[in-house]
């Protein structure tokens, strides 16, 4: 997915507009296990298919794994201010993990520009969600 390059004076015209969704990404057990190792979060619902099955039908991804993936998925179709040298993560608001993401789910990110503030050149806020099944699983 291509990035969209925008002149600073055009940023306001993107408020309320959705960007192209990211590519689909499969959340397989290897990715979940690697995240468990990196974060030292080996709760059985993430890493033990047999124990997790009666509760969720399978293992589920860590909520923070889904959240962490938004960084890379957001880069696929980012809104880039012309002349900027880089972008930084300013933070997230109102993060909610709305539904589990079962192993082997496919997720992607939908981004919508909700506000433009001239705090610093090229700085704006986005609302994003990660969807893998029939409903949004992550809102931030």
Protein language model annotation of sequence segments:
Residues 52-58, 71-110:
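Hydrophobic beta-strand-centered segment that forms part of the acyl-chain substrate-binding groove
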Residues 2-61:
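Catalytic strand-loop segment that frames the active site of acyl-thioester-processing enzymes
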